[in-house]
């Protein structure tokens, strides 16, 4: 087994954890949007969060197709977080781009 294959195999469990942690970085944005009820939504780009959602959805589908939880688990969680951002932006701003 080549060195890169051994490294990749060893990183697999860590990358699954990172895939779960990474989308959680959206939590402060969601908190500001839904809980603190600040004017924060006015500074957010609906287009950006729609693109994040679309990209995460594609990665989720790709990961499911390849039966690779390292790809689909984190991206599925990210997709849900990003959709929550999209809904919040639309609800609080009427959908500014």
UniProtKB/Swiss-Prot annotation:
Q: How does it sit in the membrane?
A: Multi-pass membrane protein
Query: What domain of life?
Result: Bacteria
Cell location: Cell membrane
Listed GO cellular component terms? membrane; plasma membrane
Q: What is its main location?
A: membrane
Q: Where is the PQ-loop domain?
A: 4-70
Task: Please provide, alphabetically and separated by semicolons, the GO molecular function terms listed in this UniProt record.
Answer: identical protein binding
Name the residues that span the membrane.
15-35, 44-65, 71-91
- Sorted UniProt keywords: Cell membrane, Membrane, Sugar transport, Transmembrane, Transmembrane helix, Transport
Describe its partners and assembly state. Homodimer.
Describe the task this protein carries out.
The homodimer mediates transmembrane sugar transport down a concentration gradient. Transport is probably effected by rocking-type movements, where a cargo-binding cavity opens first on one and then on the other side of the membrane.
| Protein name per the record | Sugar transporter SemiSWEET
Organism annotation: Vibrio sp. (strain N418)
């Amino acid at each position: 087994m080549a060195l890169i294959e051994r490294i990749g195999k060893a990183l697999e469990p860590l990358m699954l954890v990172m895939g779960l942690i990474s989308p959680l970085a959206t939590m402060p944005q969601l908190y500001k949007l839904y809980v603190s009820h600040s004017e924060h939504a006015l500074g957010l780009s609906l287009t950006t969060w729609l693109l994040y959602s679309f990209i995460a959805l594609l990665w989720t589908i790709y990961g499911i197709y390849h039966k690779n939880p390292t790809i689909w688990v984190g991206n599925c969680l990210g997709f849900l977080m990003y959709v929550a951002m999209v809904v919040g932006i639309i609800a609080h701003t009427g959908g500014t781009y």
